[in-house]
């Protein structure tokens, strides 16, 4: 994806730009810059004539506008400044980015940062603008998609009329790195599963290690069997594609400092196994590696930002397929932790691969905290829809930090409870636990299952089943929750 050159310059000359982006409030009111550039009369006239009512998300491009030395003037509606919400502001940013992408703009002055929702500051506005405009250039390109002439964005640079303070520069750098990380996450998740296999994910990690200097270690099937990863290997045994345990290490702090661990579910295609899923929309089960794609997207951002902390990634990756040798309902397997699991439903496979990954992460890296992420339960979509991801954990301060970063980036999490009362649903007559707990509280019982493997570490679980991709005519991966996780990690420094 092409990278925009973002700049901070408090003293701007309109003659230096071919496009000016201007926020407009209802009643045609605009910013101080508009008044100084004698544009207030123009926006007021357009409002009075009913040509531009400045509703949130409304845009209008004017060419060769009078009184200013720009080829284009992009008006962006913001509604009532007293009631402008974060949601409304971001809708306006996305609309502006789309309008700009459909124009010939090359060198842009962006004044949308002069219009900020209540309880936010200029650095926040710069972050959100940078994220929105950089993300708008994303276009899925792969050999599986026969596009003769891929669109080449014209936009080269965007300047904010703001001081180049440390806080503002951090906002630009963090947002752009997050957007580029999201693009990698989207590329991996959007890729057909016959291309994006566990081997492909491992090769991607190896390429990233070469680019950014990460340490990389790929565990193969024979090695994992010898180690005793009976739960992970049980899921993998029905697939022809070999499973991988993909491990990346980023060291930005002293080696003695315990790392933060990110663990991502990497089921590159989930049929449900013997407990076969319905055929409708099964193509979307290529997105069941959204947790793995998110972890790699976060590491893409880390490689660009080079923060002063240590982070490790562990990605268990496999397909979940029906076969003559696939696991069956009623089978009992022994996990790496030594705990046994009765498999009542082979479509609850994510927790089976994650539990061994969580144990391996603790044994190998001794992390200060673990955050795992997975497209784990359909119950999460029923509970929270597609607006927020679920977060559960055994350390409230860790959960609070994730929620705070989600709120700051508007890549939000909603905390759901963990309680020993839910353990009753995981009881088995034939093993230490069952891998499902029935229909009730499905997201919670899935996390309650994982909690049995994280008792000795500060741990949080993110269920991103409702946020990792969208269906319908705009089907595709979202890149979430890369922005929130990047912010969370930077806040740990």
Swiss-Prot record:
Mn(2+) 2 binds at residues 265, 270, 288, 349. One of its GO terms (molecular function) is metalloaminopeptidase activity. Mn(2+) 1 binds at residues 270, 347, 349. Binds 2 manganese ions per subunit. GO terms for cellular component: cytoplasm. The keyword Protease applies. It is found in: Cytoplasm. It comes from the Bacteria. The active site is at residues 277, 351. It catalyses: Release of an N-terminal amino acid, Xaa-|-Yaa-, in which Xaa is preferably Leu, but may be other amino acids including Pro although not Arg or Lys, and Yaa may be Pro. Amino acid amides and methyl esters are also readily hydrolyzed, but rates on arylamides are exceedingly low; Release of an N-terminal amino acid, preferentially leucine, but not glutamic or aspartic acids. Its cofactor is Mn(2+). Its EC number is 3.4.11.1, 3.4.11.10. Disulfide bonds: none annotated. Keywords: Aminopeptidase, Cytoplasm, Hydrolase, Manganese, Metal-binding, Protease. One of its GO terms (biological process) is proteolysis. Presumably involved in the processing and regular turnover of intracellular proteins. Catalyzes the removal of unsubstituted N-terminal amino acids from various peptides. Belongs to the peptidase M17 family. This is Probable cytosol aminopeptidase.
């Amino acid at each position: 994806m092409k990278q925009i050159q973002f700049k901070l310059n408090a003293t701007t000359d309109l003659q230096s730009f071919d496009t000016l982006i201007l926020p407009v409030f209802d009643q045609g009111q605009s910013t101080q810059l508009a008044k100084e550039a004698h544009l207030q009369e123009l926006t007021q006239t357009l409002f009075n004539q009913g040509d531009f009512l400045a509703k949130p998300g409304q845009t209008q491009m004017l060419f060769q506008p009078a009184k200013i030395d720009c080829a284009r003037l992009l008006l962006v509606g913001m509604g009532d400044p007293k009631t402008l919400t974060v949601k409304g502001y971001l809708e306006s940013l996305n609309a502006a980015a789309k309008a700009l992408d459909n124009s010939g703009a090359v060198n842009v002055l962006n004044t949308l940062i002069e219009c900020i929702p209540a309880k936010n500051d200029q650095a926040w506005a710069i972050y959100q603008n940078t994220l929105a405009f950089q993300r708008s250039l994303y276009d899925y390109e792969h050999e599986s998609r026969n596009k003769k002439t891929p669109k080449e964005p014209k936009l080269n640079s965007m300047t904010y009329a703001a001081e180049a303070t440390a806080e503002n520069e951090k906002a630009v750098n963090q947002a752009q790195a997050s957007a580029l990380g999201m693009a990698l996450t989207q590329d991996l998740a959007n890729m057909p599963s016959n291309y994006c296999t566990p081997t492909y994910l491992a090769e991607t990690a190896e390429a990233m290690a070469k680019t950014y200097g990460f340490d990389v270690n790929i565990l193969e099937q024979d090695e994992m069997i010898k180690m005793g990863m009976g739960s992970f290997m049980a899921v993998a045994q029905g697939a022809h594609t070999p499973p991988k345990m993909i491990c990346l290490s980023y060291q930005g702090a002293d080696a003695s400092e315990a790392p933060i661990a990110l663990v991502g579910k990497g089921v590159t295609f989930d049929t449900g196994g013997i407990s076969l899923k319905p055929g409708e929309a099964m193509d979307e089960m290529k997105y069941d590696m959204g947790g793995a794609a998110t972890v790699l997207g976060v590491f893409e951002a880390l490689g660009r930002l080079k923060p002063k902390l240590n982070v490790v990634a562990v990605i268990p990756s496999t397909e979940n397929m029906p076969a003559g040798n696939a696991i069956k309902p009623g089978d009992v397997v022994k996990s790496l932790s030594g705990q046994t699991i009765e498999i009542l439903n082979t479509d609850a496979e994510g927790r089976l691969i994650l539990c061994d990954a969580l144990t391996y992460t603790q044994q190998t890296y001794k992390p200060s905290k673990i955050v795992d992420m997975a497209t784990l339960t359909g119950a999460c979509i029923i509970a929270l829809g597609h607006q927020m991801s679920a977060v559960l954990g055994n350390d409230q301060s860790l959960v609070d930090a994730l929620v705070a970063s989600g709120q700051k980036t508007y890549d939000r999490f909603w905390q759901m409870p963990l309680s020993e009362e839910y353990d009753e649903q995981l009881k088995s007559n034939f093993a230490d636990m069952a891998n499902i707990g029935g229909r009730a509280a499905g997201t919670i019982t899935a996390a309650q299952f994982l909690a049995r493997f994280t008792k000795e570490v500060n741990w949080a679980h993110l269920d991103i089943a409702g946020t990792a991709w969208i269906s319908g005519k705009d089907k595709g991966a979202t890149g979430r929750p890369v922005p929130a996780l990047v912010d969370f990690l930077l806040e740990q420094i």
